């Protein structure tokens, strides 16, 4: 057992955690495996062994993030830089918290962790040493330590010896805030951040993704202020060093489409883009497993083995997993260290500048084409719009596809105004000569989802350049350039109008969607730059 390794109870006292006699510091995977399966554990702490060798855990009622319970301390550090929920036209989850309420929440979490046996994991967020965050995670739950060990970048022994945390994450999942009503908060649960103290507090929710996305929100604050793009995207690189990034909200295909046997994976969800190129923030992947099959997604299926951690899946008595069962949540997940995928960039998850930028959308209306090539203005317009259908279960209370607009394909994680991310991305794209594409992985007039097979063929055509050489026609109303044919893709589906019984049916739905786009983009028209982009959007 790697206990302490120089980490003392006195260091934890500096954070307000007292009477800690047993610190399990940066535990090995073997130790975590034993701890998670300890028969004396009860409730959500206890894991179950599956036939694939991975441990499965349940996260209770919190099977997704709780954006309504997210708060940021408003003080001199953040007052003039953060994109606040209570200011401006755009809606977001960055609700302000007073320093006094923060102290109260911190007291709740530190009391919860005091006197306990604690797991402490030191890890990096960001593959570039110049801009990475050194993060210390503190929890009393073994599988939560396992989750962050999977998802963040694991330091070498030398790096651990000199590790000085830039950020502290204290996970008090077992405690709640009984005074939430008097404090004007959303509920007894909380996910709170303090940029002055460089700390995140979690209370009431067991969902592991709060730690992952919490640090993403912090990178989204720190990097763009240095001129570095911070992106909710997956990324991979071809044999010739050509880099592609895939933007998209949860469930649109970021992980599936970037995990490609012909290309090496840089990462599946969070990246930066600086003067050297594209780099991963993470050391693992967090894949959706609902309806997972070995045939359709062999790389992800084969990554589910010892050291992977499954969340909220149904495990039968014999240890087999029913991946089709979404009764707990549609947002069933697995986290695994990135090296569980064979074809990855080594030893560091980074590569050169991106030349292909792909916006993934899952259009529940069945209006948008499976692929279109964007102009420079359309690139900014669709990046700021961030349209998709919210897919079942990534957030609590959402089970059917509903249309949503999420700025920069990740509004929930943005800490600055969306236009700041668009400006940085455009600068990086222009310098690299990158081209953007809009790819619909959602539905069409048949009422069925566009097949993974067709989407993969579309991605191949983008990456090998054949789409850029294809003849195109323009889809009315949305003004999108669509190829007339692509190798390996059913030509009938390229024009979405052809998938309907009559063109009028498409027209009717298209008008509905166009109006939603126009109404949503109104929030950007309070600046001249935003107003200038309106022409790149749909026209009624």
Curated annotation (Swiss-Prot):
Q: Which GO terms describe its biological process?
A: gluconeogenesis
Name the GO cellular-component terms.
cytosol
The Enzyme Commission number assigned here is: 4.1.1.49
Catalyzed chemical reaction(s): oxaloacetate + ATP = phosphoenolpyruvate + ADP + CO2
Q: What is this protein called?
A: Phosphoenolpyruvate carboxykinase (ATP)
The record's section on NCBIfam families has: pckA, PRK09344.1-1, PRK09344.1-2, PRK09344.1-3
Q: What class of enzyme is it?
A: lyase
Query: Assembly and interactions?
Result: Monomer.
Residue positions binding ATP: 213, 232, 248-256, 297, 333, 449-450, 455
Family matches, as PANTHER family: PHOSPHOENOLPYRUVATE CARBOXYKINASE (ATP), PHOSPHOENOLPYRUVATE CARBOXYKINASE ATP
Primary localization class, coarse: cytoplasm
Instruction: Provide the residue positions that the database annotates as binding substrate.
Output: 65, 207, 213, 333
Taxonomy, top ranks, is:
Bacteria, Pseudomonadati, Pseudomonadota, Gammaproteobacteria, Enterobacterales
Q: Quick one: which residues bind Mn(2+)?
A: 213, 232, 269
Organism from which the protein derives? Shigella flexneri serotype 5b (strain 8401)
Report if keyword Nucleotide-binding is assigned.
Answer: yes
Question: Cofactor stoichiometry and binding?
Answer: Binds 1 Mn(2+) ion per subunit.
Localization: Cytoplasm
What molecular function terms (GO) are annotated for this protein? ATP binding; metal ion binding; phosphoenolpyruvate carboxykinase (ATP) activity
Question: Could you name the domain of life of the organism this protein comes from?
Answer: Bacteria
